[in-house]
Amino acid sequence: MYIEIMDTTLRDGEQTSGVSYTATEKLHISRLLLEEVKVDRIEVASARVSSGELEAVKSITEWAAKAGYLEKVEVLAFIDGMQSVEWIRKAGAKTVNLLSKGSLKHLTGQLRKTPETHLSDIRQIVANATQLGMNVNLYLEDWSNGMRNSKDYVFYLVDNLKDAALQRIMLPDTLGILSPDEVFLFCKEMCERYPDVHFDFHAHNDYDLAVANSIAAVKAGVFGIHTTVNGLGERAGNTPLASVVAALKDHTAVNLQINEEKLTLTSKMVETFSGVRIPANKPVVGENVFTQACGVHADGDNTCQGRISGAFTQTVDGGVNSVYSCIDGS
């Protein structure tokens, strides 16, 4: 089974406190992700944020159109009539990621709308956008709470949208509340109820479970996973791109087109542009990943090479580095 990787470093990742990219930095990251890392899609902005953001997206779409990547460049849109869609068209993008409410609590408390009205609004925007030749994906914001507390509402929406002109329906664990067991059960329920729908899973890392939850979603049958470079994002961040790629490659039978050899370079670039340091012990891309101070472990790797295998070695550009310490056995 082929799994799409959609990276949202430039949209959800930029919601990290203190992080703001220049237009030039956004273009560099976009090119690296699509040309070198070969992620399937990138989400680069939220519509209607600012005139500066509009210009940044234009620079990305102008390059992407020439390079053949335009439909891989996605922008978040809101339920605001056609204002977001028109902003995205003006920016030169072709793919709309429409943000709808995936829980009844969010719908009634935040938007103060009925399910019927919300459904009508969604259908109208989808119809109008597709008439303009645009692709539309749909986020079900707070879907995780929706499945826990208002499942009938979730099913009402998808029952009435499964035949709409949607490319994908995207399932966010917006507040990072789910365990891998819940993710598997909820995603499996969605995939079995709607076998013809392409579902993505969008994890947040509040319990340090984003990678585990993403793997659980893949095992349940979703076709896409959302990531950010270095796990950037609000609160505890999103699913780290390098970590989930290594885990999927080494622990599942799915197919990816990711070039693992470029992941460390990408992490370093985003570290520089974002100003958010990569911890030395960060899995896969941290500088201590292949550094060992314990003599027993170092000897085991030297003689058996038991831990170093598969995508993990390709992801990190280097071999094991043994260092002197009080427990090195020398």
PLM features per residue range, with description:
Residues Y2-I3, D7-T9, A253-S330:
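A mid-to-C-terminal "edge-of-domain" accessory segment
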Residues I3-I5, R11-R41, S59-G68, G81-V197, ...:
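Alpha/beta enzyme core
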Residues H28, L34-S59, T313-S330:
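Terminal or standalone catalytic/regulatory effector modules within metabolic enzymes
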